[in-house]
Amino acid sequence: YMIAGNHDAWSGSSDPIKWIAKQQGALYKSSEARLELNFPCGRKVRVNARHDFAGSSIWNPAHGPMKAAMLGSRDHIYVAGHKHESAYSVLKDPQNGIAMHAIKVASYKVYDRYAKERGFRDNALSPCVVTVINPDLPETHPDMVKVFWEPEVAAEYLTWLRGRR
């Protein structure tokens, strides 16, 4: 899935994210998407992806997704971009015990004249994030969702995980 956000405002009349999604056959939404992934074992995992979540903190870049997790719809994964910063936090839903993952992903925008001109700090750990879901673990287990900042490492973990079955 791909969330566009405001990329069309920076790239002229068309949205490059929409073009990439079409080329890859990926789900494309303009600002948000909530997905429920259904696994053969019966596990259901909910993903809440937005260009950004309301709320910010100078101390915690993951504040917006964390706020949505604690006050919102109780999904398993909350992921947003917008400010091109990386952050991650795991929370436990006190009502039903599920582990909720709040993620901010930077981007592949390496050369950012706009950020440099305005003095924005480089808070990008990685240009991407990959979540690998182990549907065999209970939704209360924090490792049901594993977060990786390197796609190759995520692929190796997924291969290892599948080999255990």
Language-model regions: role of each:
Residues 46-47, 53-147:
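Conserved beta-sheet core of the metallophosphoesterase superfamily
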Residues 1-30:
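Core catalytic region of metal-dependent phosphoesterases/phosphodiesterases
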Residues 8, 41-43, 137:
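Residues that cap or initiate secondary-structure elements
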Residues 2-4, 39, 49-53:
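Short, structured patches in soluble enzyme cores that scaffold and shape functional sites
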Residues 28-29, 36, 48-50, 103:
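General small-molecule cofactor/ligand-binding pocket signal
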Residues 22-30, 34-38, 71-78:
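Extended low-complexity acidic/polar segments
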Residues 31-42, 89-96:
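Short acidic-hydrophobic surface loop/beta-edge motif
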Residues 138-165:
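MPN/JAMM (Mov34/JAB) isopeptidase/deubiquitinase module and associated MPN-bearing subunits/adaptors
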